[in-house]
Structures are given as C-alpha cells and as structure tokens.
Amino acid sequence: MGQGVLRGEGHPNNNPNSKVGWKSLVGIITIFMLILCDQSDGKICYSMDIRNNISQFSMLEDCTVIEGHLQILLMFTSKPENFRGLRFPKLTTITDYLLLFRVYGLESLKDLFPNLTVIRGTRLFFNYALVIFEMVHXKEIGLYNLMNITRGSVRIEKNNELCYLSTIDWSIILDSVEDNYIELNRDNKEECGDVCPGTVKGKSKCKHTLVNGALVERCWTQDHCQKVCPSDCKGSGCLPDGQCCHPECLGSCRKPNDPSECTACRHFQNEGVCVTACPKGSYQFQGWRCIDFNTCQELNSRCQNSRDNSCPPYVIHKGECMPDCPSGYIANSTTRTCTPCAGPCPKVCTIFQNVKTIDSVTSAQELRGCTVINGSLIINLRGGNNIATELEANLGLIEEISGYLKIRRSYALVSLSFFRKLRLIRGEVLEAGNYSFYALDNPSLRQLWDWHKHNLTIIHGKLFFHHNPRLCLSQIHQMEEVTGTKGRQDKNDIATKTNGDQASCEDNLLTFNFIKTSHDMVLLRWDAYWPPDYRDLLGFMVHYKEAPFQNVTEFDGQDACGSNSWTVVDMDAPERSADGKTQSPGCLLRSLKPWTQYAVFVKTLVSGSDEGRTYGAKSKIIYIRTNETIPSVPLDPFSVSNSTSQIILKWKPPSEPNGNVTHYLVYWQEQPEDSDLYEVDYCNKGLKLPSRTWTPPTEIDENGNENQTEHTSVNKCCPCPKTEFQIQKEQDESAFRKTFENYLHNEVFIPRPVRKRRDLFGVANGTLPDPVTAPPLFNVSSTRAPDEPEPKIYSQKVWFKESVLISGLKHFTGYRIEIHACNHELSMGCSVAAYVNARTMPEATADKVVGPITYEYVEPNIIHLKWQEPKDPNGLIVLYEVHYSRVGGIEEVITCVSQKQYNTDKGGKLRVLTPGNYSVKIRATSLAGNGSWTEQAYFQVPDHPHSNIVKIITGPIIAVFLLLIVLVYCVVQKKKDAEGPAGPLYTSSNPEYLSASEVYIPDEWEVPRDKINLLRELGQGSFGMVYEGIAKDIIKGEPEVRVAVKTVNESASLRERIEFLNEASVMKAFNCHHVVRLLGVVSKGQPTLVIMELMAHGDLKSYLRSLRPDAENNPGRLAPTLKEIIQMAAEISDGMAYLNAKKFVHRDLAARNCMVADDYAVKIGDFGMTRDIYETDYYRKGGKGLLPVRWMSPESLKDGVFTAFSDVWSFGVVLWEITSLAEQPYQGLSNEQVLKFVMDGGSLDHPENCPPRLHSLMQMCWQYNPKMRPTFLEIIDMLKDDLRPSFQDVSFYYSDENKPPETDDLEIDFENMESTPLDPSSCSLRDQSSRTNIYEEHIPYTHMNGGRKNGRILSLPRSSPS
C-alpha cells in the first residue's frame, strides 16, 4: 500500500522546532496506518510529498484516493525517459490539492494519472487546488479525465513549453473561473499549434464550447478530447455515449444511474456506494466517506496511546467523526460524544509540552474560549496595540490553571485584570521547583487584581516577585492574604528593593570573552560574575537587535507604553561549584538574519541585598555581524533579442543578498526544436502552422518599466500612458505574484542539515545545491533525436552589474538561460537559479532555397522536382510551396510539399497533364514564417514517346466502340417509342401539341382530383398560383388534412409544365421532417396539381419581417430568442444534412427558401414558390442565369463550384438573416460590389444585438477555405444540448439513416459533390469549354438541384423567370 510523507496540517512534524520522540512518531504513524487500512480495498493513501528522486513515485502504487495533498517537486536530474512506464491508473481522487513544481523531464500527466477525475480542494495551497509552476519541460497538462475541482482555483504559471491551455474549458471543471491565474506559459505567446483529435484528417472529433465569445474545440492533447457532458448531468459526469451518471456521482462513473459505480461521490461514500448522507450507525469522516463508531473510537484510542499532546481526541458529533467538539459543546470522556454545555461551556485546553508562552495576540488567540488550562502559562508581552482588550477577549474565560502562572518581562501590562475569571492555580507543576506564581521584570505592572472583587486560590507553591518597579509591595502582601500563600515565601522570594521602586543599579562591567558566529546564530560567553551573596544573582538578560549603524543606546525604542525594540533572552544563573570556580556563562542567539549587524549587551538580574544595595552588572553595547550565506534567487529576469546572434539579459538583485553580491553566473544552452513537428503534414489546410516568436528589443528604465526602442516603433503610434488604475492593478498583481512565490518557496523547500556536530553550531542548511563548481542542472527535452548530441552548456561570470549581452548565438534559436547570484563567500555556493527562455531574431535569408532546381520525368505526366534544403534555416522547415504555370498560360498552380514528404523524395512530385514548357519557383516556410521565392526555373513536359502510335492504334478502336454504342442506343430508343413516352426525355418536333400526360407517367403518387378542394390563395409561385386546400385520404389515418396546392398557369408552355412535374418527381426522393414533403400529384386532366405539406406561416423571410416591431402584419409575437434561433438553425441544418446524405446540393439556401410550419418548425422549402416573389434577390451576371450573389460562397462566385461546403456558407448568411429579422445582406452594396467584396475575402458584419455564440458560428461558416467550414452534422452537434427534446424524435440527425456508410459507394465526397444538371444541351461539344462558361450559360438556379445518386444523374428543371 502506498503511504505518503506524514506532513498534513496540524501534524507535529510540520513544525521544524518541534521535538517529538521516536515513540510519539511511531504512534502517529500507527494512527494513519489505521486510517489507511480502514478501507477494505486498501486503496486510500495519505498526503504525499514526492521530491528529489523519481523512485519515490513507488508510494503511489495502488492508491485510489489520496486523502490529503499530492506534491511532486524539485527533481532536477530526471529526464523524459525516466517517466516512461510510470503509470498510476488507479488514482481517481485527491481530497486536497495537486502541486507540480520544477520537475525536469515531465512532459505530460496523461500517462502518469490517466484516470484522475476529482480534486476536492478540502485544503488548498494558497487558495488553489491545482498548481503547475515552473515545469520547464511540460508540454501539456494531459489530465483528460479530470472532470471536477470542487473547491479552489487553478494556477498555471511560468511553464515555458506548456501548450493546450486555450483548448481547455475550465468552466466545465470549476464552478467559478474568475480566480484562475494562467499566465507566462507558451500558450500565451501564440506559439502553440494545438491540434485536437481528428483535425489533421479534417474531421473534428471534439466538442466545441463557447468561452468569452469564442466557440473553440476542446481537448487536452492531440489524442484526447475534453469530456463535455450534457447540461442535464449537472456535474455528475457521463459515459462516452452521453448517458448521465447517478446524481450522487461526481465527475464520472462506470455505469449510468448506479450509485455503486461512481468514480467519486458528490457527498459521501459508504461501503463503495455514493450516498447523500451517511446511514445510521456510520459517521462522516474527512468530508467524503463514512466510517463506523468503532473505527472513530479506535482513532481516539491510538491517539491517546501515542502520548502526543497535539494528537486530536476524535469525538462523535452530529453524525461526524471529528478531531474535537465545536464551540458550545464538551466531550464526554466515556462515550466520546459531544454534549451541550450548561451555561458557558467548560473547555479544557491541554498545553503542548505543558508550557504555553503568550508573547503575542496571535498566541493568545489559540486559547480563546478555554476555561481550564491543563499546563502552565508564561505571559511575555513586549508591546502591542489595544493589548489589554485583546487579552481579555482571548484569556478572560480561563478559570483554572493546573501548573503555574509566570508574568515575565511584559512591558505592555499594567494589570492582570484581563484574567477576570481566574479562580484557581493548582501548582501541580512549579517554576524552578518552588513557585506557582512568578512575576519578574514587568516595568509597567501596577496592579495584580482588584482584590476587593477578585478571589484567587493557589493550592501549591510560593509567590515570586522581583523587578517590578511600579508594583507596590502592598499589592503583593494583599495577594498573599487572598491566595492563602502567606508564610510560604522566603525573604528572597519577594524583593523589597526592586518591587515598587523606580531605581536599578548596575555598578560592575561585564566583559565578553568568546564570540562565534554563523549565518543565523551567535554564541556568546562572558566573564563570570557573582554578587557578595551569590544567592542574589537570579540570572542574566541578553539584549540584542538589528543595528545598521553603530549608534545604538540601551533605551532606544522604549516608551511608557511598554514598546521595546530590543529582543531579550533570559539565562539562568550558572551553578556554583563547591570550590567557587564557575564556567563562564553563555547564550546562543538563534534565528538571526545572515550578513546582518546586531547590537548586543548583557546585564544581570539580581535581588536587593540585606544592606539595601543592588549589586548588578552590565556590559557595554557591542556590534556583531552574522556570517554570509547563499543569496536568494535573482528577481524578475528579462530577456530580449536585438539581433540574430545576441540576447540582452537583465535582472534585479536578490531580495536577500545574504552577503555582498559580487557577481552572477549566467548559463545558457540551446534548446532543440520539437522534432514532432516533422511528423505532422502542415499541408493539410485544417492545421494552423506552428510559429515561434521572439521578443522585440526593449529598454528597461530604472523603475523596471519597459520602453520599446526607437526602431521598433517606426510608423506606429506611441502607446497611451497607463492610467493610475492600470498602474495600481499591475502593482497589486506583481505583489500578489511575489507573495505566492514566497509562500511556495517557504512551503516546498524543507531545510536539512549539511553536517552533524556535537556543539551548539550544528548550522542547518536548506535544500539548495552544493557550491556551484559544475554546469547547472540543465535537462534536455525528448524533442532531441536519440542519436543527436546534447547541446553544449555555455557560461559567463558577470561582475558587479545586473545585465549581460550574450553574443555568438545561432539565429532564431531558443535558449534556456539560468542566472545564479553569488556573494563573496564562494565556499557557500551560489543561489538557486532564476531562469528565462529567449529566442534570437530570425535571419532574413536563412529560409531561402539556394542552388539549382532540377527535374526528372519519372512517368507519364509526373515530374519529380528536386532542390536543396536550406542549410541553416530559422528553426525548422515545416513545408515548401511550389508555384508553377505553363509558359504563356494564365492558370497558376501552387502545391504544397510537407517536410516529411521532402525527406522521402528529396523534393516534390507534380502531376502535370498537359505537355509544354513550364516555369516554377519555390519557397520554404519555417517556424519564423515564409521565406523568399527562388528565381524562376523551367522544365519541359514532353509528349509521351509512344503517343502517336497509341493514337493510331486506339483511334479506330474507339471509333468502332462509339458506333456500337450509338446503334444500341437507337435500338433501345425505338423500342421505347413503341411502348409510349416515359421519363424526362422528349423528342417531338412540335412539343406544343403534347399534353403533360405524354411526358409524365402516373405512379403511386397520383391522387384523384375529386379528393382535393381548394380554399384560398396563398401566393404566386414560379409556375402559377399556390392555394391552401383540403385533401382527403391521402395520409394514412387522417381523413382530411390541410395542404398547399401548386398549380401551373393556363398560359404555361409545355416545357414549363414538364419542369413543373419534374420538380415534383425530384421531391419524391425526399422523406425528412425538416424538408417540406410532397404528398401527391394530380397529373390527369387540367390543371395539373402538385400537393405539398402546408407551411402555415409561409416562407421564413416573410415570417421574420413580420416580427419586426413596426411591421403592419405583426402577429403579436416578439423577435425570436436565442433558444428559438438555435432551434431554427438546428432544424435547417438537419434538413440540409439529409439532402447532403442523399447527395443533393442545394445551391440556393436562403431564408426565402425555408418555410415555417404551423408549430413554427423551419423546413427546407419546396420548389417554385419564391423565385418570382423575390426576384430582386437575384442578379444576372453577364446576361446569363440569375445568381443569388449575396448568399454565395467565394469559390462559387469565382469558379462556379458548388459543394456541401458552399451550402454551409449560405447557411451562415441565413443565420445572419434570422438575427437581423431578414435584412438584406450587404445592405448598401451593389451586386457587383458584393461580388468583388466576397471574392476578396470579405464577409458580413456582426449583426446588431447578435449573441457571441451565434456570431462565432457564422464566422465558422464563412471561412474562406471551404475545408475549414463545419459540416451540417457538426453544426447540429454544437447545438444539440440546447434543443427541444422533440428534436430527437423527428430529426434525421438522430435517425437510423444517419449512420456511417458501410461501403465506398455510399461515401460522400463533399469537396467534389458538385451540382451538374443534365439537359439536352449539356451533351454538346460545349462541355469542353471552361467550367465558368457552363455555370453561366447552362445552370440556372433552382431551389433544389440533384447531384450524383447511385451512379446516374437526375435531370433537373429550369425554373428561371422569363
């Protein structure tokens, strides 16, 4: 079982000054072993401090819960390979906090703690539950199963390699993110190319969430998404399929809705089951689990047997096993339960080591509420504000002291009346073996108690009063009478000369004969002194204080209020041997500051002699300086690069020089680039290119303010001066950072002795390294190839200044720099390092491809280009761009060659179809950006050597084959003509004599005319009027249903009638709730009717405009809310996703072509309803077909390319229409201006009052690169958590049809899914003309156009307005 270092709160080992015997330590360990073994599975471990050696990780073996904190820190020699194979998958919960600090080589926690789910934060580290600080090699956090930080915040700071921070949504893990502090990491420098799972392949796998107005994909690493559960789960966690865990779970579970399968519990865990409260017979323990009564009692028994007074006496109270009873309750020693007090609650306070010194208000507060002191009290108050009131508030309830009460050198005390309830001093333990009340050297003490009102009994022991010059003897004699101690005292116990007098005599001079110093201690010895009656010598008082200048007097800093700037150490009088020889008395002054001058003097403390004289003695004030020691770390290191080979480094002196800082040691080492970048194909347009930045040159003034140098601000405005509020805020943040760092260093650095000695000067040293005689503890990350030598470490000494110019560096190279402060005592070593990362500036020509570009004709139509890689690029080359075009031609082609492909081919391969002479130029892209283009080179693509022979042989064969196809076609066509016309083809030389029935064959969709009754006109469509009607028996189970009936005008031509029915034929293929459904066709007789699903609220554009406040036809509804807009967007996306799955491309998605049903559901509209109504929304480009340019994507406007991605662009415009209540897109621009604006990369502005979430979705749809736009299914995935439950029942997204394809025939190629309608003219020779011409002349816009389906092309109607 893993067991941590026992350093929890309240543990005696936390106090470096505590002295706990080995028996006590064994008892303490036994108690915590009981806690560990209490669980049947043996998986609970206590707080752990893993430091210095990686072998200490073995303590974590088999731990499931750490009941306490986990600190991993200070490993300077570990390397990445040391952590490979270290894995603790059982650890799921930490009850306090997780701290990581300066662990070299640790790059990620994904393998170390793959299942850590909950950090409870019961006790925090400076208000933080997760601290990651100065992890020099960490690249990612990687806690991909972390779902809940119950209490506290997150602090991630000064991790120069740490990425994947902007891809984490902390609001999912924490209740509040306002107090998080995430600064000074690589992520903040925009250097991270964070790639979430699936991004490389263009198929995002991770969910998107909205933070600060940005909709971002969420992941922990390139292999692990951040787990985002549905909002219904409310923090309980969920399974991968989205099923919520039981409400009592916290973070995760193994089965849904099962409290026994939780990873962690929201409230309490009882025998493996999560419960709201512990059941009867069990008790809450440590805030998260239940234990039985016997276990709690056993904890208390073990604690008592340990003989450790600080061990808490566990009791049962209100269903909880706790260390002590709360205020207002007292523990029953038999049952170990808490019972309410009758009146003021007696509270027995047991004093650690039997003596408690009250030397400050803070120490007095520790006894607040105590009524019985089981031990002795020493009052030693040198000063303070409002001290009497504070003492009465904290000590005023004490009624009984079992030992003695000693008032010593309390300059601030005038009276002891603050002990207002003190009634009994038992004297079970006596001071100096005799005294139960001891008052010594209290110059302001004038009154003990008001003896007329106060009663005090002293059972054992005597009184002792000396050197209380303002305390009258009458007060002392009266105390003898009241307390019952009269007659117990000897004549020397109460000094008649030094109590109540205002004088003190020190006639003799004491001389120091031995002085020895260390960095924090001084040992003093002085000549022995005895008064004539050696019994009058009570002891010595050694006074000392810091003295920067040698002008101190004894009475500096003392006043009538008791303030005293001197620190006083009391020393007992030495024992007097029989022969009268006495060892020189001495004193060891501890806890001094290094390299600090102190003023010191010593004086005797004597009683008055029988003759009335006081035989005192005092030394002169001497000045002693403590020794130097290792300085503290240099402050605020700052680095800039002013050229391609230099870095300017500045810092501030250490806050504690601990000597005269003479010089600094500066070490620097080149940091290799991340070799993983070679493995990623950055030619994939879905990936962001990695980058590295350098800090532009700046100047730092004397106050530490940064000013940009002149050459960086050319042609730029000067920065505005900071306001007082900004300056104050920066100062507060800086002060808080320093406070946190001081707290961190104080907590994690545990002093340890360098050597052991038997004398008083066993000086303790910290965990700092030995004297620096070797290079520092640099550690190279695993980004370096195994066979690559480790970069050399360089060093330089910097004398008497805090800056250095490091020269001779490589261009655009990262360096890790360490700065050590050294003082004149080099044998002690130099300080812990302050480190900073810097990068030199890029070389302008380093990324240029030099040398000739050669080519090789490897196979037909493939050219292998070869070129030399830049010898010394700026960082790494990530890709090459090859720009080539046919000489004299117009079309230019740019192709991308990844570094990985270049390493394989030593160049790139081009597929060139057309023979001819070509020009080519190449440029490289490095971590610093794009290099420059090479000079143009030329290559020739020849005709295939055997092309003429092939043509001679294959020509006749092809001609014969085509002739056979024509003959077969004619035979089949003749047979069809004999059977009668069918399908969309017609060949009549005079089509006006044909009726619709001759080109349309009735099928199962045919509806008898007498089942349709027309009620009223709805509006004019493309072919004729549209009516509302009643249809009988056309929907199973519904005798009558309201429908929309489309008609064709009587004056319509035969072609228009054919197109009218063809549109109906196309819609027969659709069966989706969010696409308007065809219900039937009446083709027999005139007029021809098409029966459609009735959309009661008309088209979406008209409906939105009716919701405007000033609209005359406003139905009384308000503008749609955010939730309603999201519902509309999902319904439109669902209909479009269905059409994409059917391999149809819409090409004209707009609000006018969406319909609103009676229940306000939005559906993709039917055909022919809106072309004439909204003809102004279309534009006739070059006299050709009508184009909806304001809804078209850039690639559609440029090249006539229509794909599912171009429909997504149009969907973004529809969203804009919904939020603006159907305003015209690009209002104020003409159609020609819109064409140019969009093709140049423009898009619509932010709509007024548009929520950030919707605008982020619009921007995703308007990505210029089509591949960067989301699919309609991905859009629904982003919105699904906010949709109505009914959406799951009716949508295509949740239907069985929306499943991954099982065969290649069903795969959708979104990039090539172009809309290419066929009509008689499309089979002409004009197919060989440019795609743009075909688009302009032969593809008019319809509301729904077919694409490829099952290997054939559906002919589509031409519904251009005449």
UniProtKB/Swiss-Prot annotation:
**TM regions (residue ranges):** 952-972
| Membrane topology annotation | Single-pass type I membrane protein
Per UniProt, activity regulation is: Autophosphorylation activates the kinase activity.
**Any idea which positions bind ATP?**
S1022, K1046, E1093, L1094, M1095, A1096, H1097, G1098, D1099, R1152, N1153, D1166
The record's EC number reads 2.7.10.1
Q: Which reaction does it catalyse?
A: L-tyrosyl-[protein] + ATP = O-phospho-L-tyrosyl-[protein] + ADP + H(+)
Tell me where the signal peptide lies.
1-37
Domain Protein kinase: start-end pairs: 1012-1287
- Compositionally biased, Polar residues: which spans? 705-714
Q: What is this protein called?
A: Insulin receptor
Write down the species. Xenopus laevis (African clawed frog)
